[in-house]
């Protein structure tokens, strides 16, 4: 019994000593800071690809094969933007760019087409009824020089007018009367060379030759010997080949940049070795309703006739705008109804801002308004930040501010 009592007493004494030691240790250990031991409060979980859908616990996204991301209470945005865990932004490769001011450069190629110069276009008519005596061996597509004979014909009205002229000369008609007859012949279409021959020889001519009035290519010629011809019949159509026209359709949005022929570089795949000289250019006023383009017409030297109507060509436009605000095009978020960027403020917060886009070219976008020179915009890794801005309500605040400024 004494041994049992001794054992029990020893156990009780040991427990008291242990309890006392624990109490002393607990009192001696300094309290840890609450901020280091307290866990960050999670508001909800979400899939960055579908930020408007929230979940009450972690796991795999039902939409994508990726883990849900926590939304922490201390990430709630202030009125000026949102904060994001630096680890997340680093993992996503978030990059920024500075808003600059400078000219927006354009270097774009447009398909073009070679065509006849409509200013060098001649229609040959007899302008009086008659019949064809001879047609010279020509057809559509043949090249002719100015003065090349096309056909011989007899015009009874011209023969009659010549008879009147000679009769007045023989009977002492006045100069006014004879000149009136000659003018009538001119108006009726009698060639000037034949009128001079009449005056010189004082003999009636019964056969007349119609000749090409310009150098060019015959584009219409369908007459045969023995045919009757009315005064309004077209004998031939001839179109010049030097210069030719080269036309290209350019978007109406960049038409304002076209100022000078030095901006153009013209090439023809069929003649890559040929240097083309642009005499002048014209931007036609009409806009194609279907394509929203304007026709740019170039007048190009073609003395050697190497350029043929119907050939394909390429027009390179090299130009630059006046200085304006520029950002990388990849920094722009365009939803169709809204264009915005994500800026970075001095405190490192991401702030969405609505912008007005003017034009874009070669990966650079020019802005009308919305930013200032020197601001920082996110140019890579936009998706996560834009999702956070949507979740936190920063986008709604941006829209509200835009609506307030609009009023």
Curated annotation (Swiss-Prot):
Protein's UniProt keywords contain Cell inner membrane: no
Quaternary organization: The cus efflux system is composed of CusA, CusB, CusC and CusF.
Regions crossing the membrane: none
One of the Pfam families matching this protein, by short name: CusB_dom_1
UniProt-recorded name of the protein: Cation efflux system protein CusB
InterPro entries: CusB-like_dom_1, CusB_D23, HMBD, MFP_Cation_Efflux, RND_pump_MFP
Note: The cus system plays an important role in copper tolerance under anaerobic growth and, under extreme copper stress, in aerobic growth.
Record's keyword terms, sorted: Copper, Copper transport, Ion transport, Signal, Transport
Molecular function GO labels: copper ion binding; copper ion transmembrane transporter activity; transition metal ion binding
UniProt key word Manganese: no
Family classification: Belongs to the membrane fusion protein (MFP) (TC 8.A.1) family.
Triggers of expression: Transcriptionally regulated by CusR in response to copper and silver ions.
Biological process per Gene Ontology, one example term: response to copper ion
Record's function text: Part of a cation efflux system that mediates resistance to copper and silver.
Gene Ontology cellular-component terms listed: cell envelope; membrane; outer membrane-bounded periplasmic space
Domain of life (superkingdom): Bacteria
Signal peptide limits: 1-28
Gene3D superfamilies: 2.40.30.170, 2.40.420.20, 6.10.140.730
Xref: NCBIfam families: PRK09783.1, RND_mfp
């Amino acid at each position: 019994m004494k041994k049992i009592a001794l054992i029990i007493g020893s156990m009780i004494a040991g427990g008291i000593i242990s309890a006392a030691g624990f109490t002393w240790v607990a009192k001696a250990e300094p309290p840890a800071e609450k901020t280091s031991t307290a866990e960050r409060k999670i508001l909800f979980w979400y899939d960055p690809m579908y930020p408007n859908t929230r979940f009450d616990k972690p796991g795999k996204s039902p939409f994508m094969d990726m883990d849900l991301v926590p939304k922490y209470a201390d990430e709630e945005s202030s009125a000026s933007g949102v904060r994001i865990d630096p680890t997340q932004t680093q993992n996503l490769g978030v990059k920024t760019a500075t808003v600059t001011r400078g000219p927006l450069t354009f270097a774009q190629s447009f398909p073009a087409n070679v065509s006849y110069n409509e200013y060098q276009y001649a229609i040959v008519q007899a302008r009086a009824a008659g019949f064809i005596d001879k047609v010279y061996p020509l057809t559509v597509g043949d090249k002719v020089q100015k003065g090349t004979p096309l056909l011989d014909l007899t015009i009874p009205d011209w023969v009659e007018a010549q008879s009147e002229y000679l009769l007045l000369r023989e009977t002492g008609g006045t100069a006014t009367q004879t000149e009136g007859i000659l003018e009538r012949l001119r108006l009726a279409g009698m060639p000037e060379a034949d009128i001079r021959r009449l005056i010189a020889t004082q003999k009636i001519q019964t056969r007349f030759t119609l000749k090409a009035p310009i150098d060019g290519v015959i584009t219409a010629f369908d007459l045969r010997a023995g045919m009757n011809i009315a005064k309004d019949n077209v004998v031939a159509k001839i179109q010049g080949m030097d210069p030719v026209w080269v036309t290209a359709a350019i978007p109406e949005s960049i038409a304002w940049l076209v100022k000078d022929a030095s901006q153009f570089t013209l090439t023809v795949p069929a003649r890559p070795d040929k240097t083309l000289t642009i005499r002048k250019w014209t931007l036609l006023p009409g806009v194609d309703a279907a394509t929203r383009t304007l026709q740019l017409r170039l007048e190009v030297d073609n003395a050697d006739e190497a350029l043929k109507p119907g050939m394909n060509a390429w027009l390179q436009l090299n130009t630059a705008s006046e200085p304006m605000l520029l950002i990388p095009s990849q920094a722009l978020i365009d939803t169709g109804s809204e264009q915005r960027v994500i800026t970075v403020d001095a405190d490192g917060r991401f702030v969405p801002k609505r912008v007005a886009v003017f034009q874009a070219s070669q990966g650079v976008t020019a802005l009308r308004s919305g930013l200032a020179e020197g601001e920082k915009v996110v140019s890579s890794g936009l998706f996560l930040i834009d999702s956070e801005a949507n979740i936190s309500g920063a986008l709604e605040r941006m829209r509200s501010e835009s609506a307030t400024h609009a009023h």
